Amino acid sequence: MSDNWIVQNLENALKTWNDKLSEIWQLITQSPEQFKGGTIWNVIVDIHGAVQAIGLALLVLFFVVGVMKTCGSFAEVKKPEHALKLFIRFALAKGVVTYGLELMMALFNIVQGLISTIMNAAGFGSAAQTVLPQEIVTAVEDCGFFESIPLWAVTLIGGLFITILSFIMIMSVYGRFFRLYLYTAIAPVPLSTFAGEPSQNVGKSFIKSYAAVCLEGAIIVLACIIFSLFADSPPAVDPNAAPVSMVWSYIGELVFNMLVLVGAVKMADRVVREMMGL
């Protein structure tokens, strides 16, 4: 690393960005069981098991309410075709509540397979690193004391922007994991609504929303791949320009590219919901 304070400030900001981008790449390929050593997942599974008892009780309630609303009289319930239909609905709903965790993890693993396919097809094993061009390093190091004063302000502002964008981006990815945990913990309650025909739309909406959260990972990976391609062709640097103009131009274009990535990551949930019509 250079001994120049201005260069160090920019390189530290880019290091923070690269570290967070690498962390995102690692988090996206992790399952909830592996996240943070699996400690959170173990607690969520225990909560899921406790809520499952409530879900089974609600299952009976939704089933009875559904029977009362869909059948005009008790005589209809006694008809073999109606009785069979109700029995199948109840059995399927109970299976969904009992094995809800396994079903949700199966759906998550399907999306993880999609993410791996996208990565392999793009030929990316990890996120590309953003590096400060040597032309800027040389120009800044050649500046005198008074010439470097404006550069301090430019690099402070640019470094602050890059650091803030790094943390906004990583917070969005952590937010996805927290939503996965929330959906998993409370799943038996909305899944129990499948027992009644009038209430089944709640269960359908829950499954769609959970699938949307899982698919956010694929959108985030695509956004990171596109940014990595941008990073492979860094902003053009005019070696004949003044150092302040050179640094300002570089930081401006770099921050714009980063804003595009952060915006895509932040809007991943909205993009998926628009795709799925939610």
What are these regions (language model features)?
Residues L191-K208, N240, V271-M275:
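Alpha-helical transmembrane segments
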Residues M1-L58:
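Binding/recognition "hotspot" determinant
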Residues K94-I186, C224-G277:
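Non-cytosolic segments of integral membrane proteins
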Residues E23-Q26, H82-R89, N109, S116, ...:
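Short amphipathic alpha-helical coupling elements at transmembrane boundaries
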Residues S2-L10, P80-G100, G203-V213, A268:
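Alpha-helical transmembrane segments and their helix-start/interface "positive-inside/aromatic belt" motifs
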Residues A53-V65, I157, F161-T163, L180:
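Hydrophobic alpha-helical transmembrane segments
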Residues L58-K94, I186-Q200:
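Hydrophobic transmembrane alpha-helix segments characteristic of membrane transport
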Residues I44-Q52, L84-I88, L92, E141, ...:
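Alpha-helical membrane-interface segments at transmembrane helix boundaries
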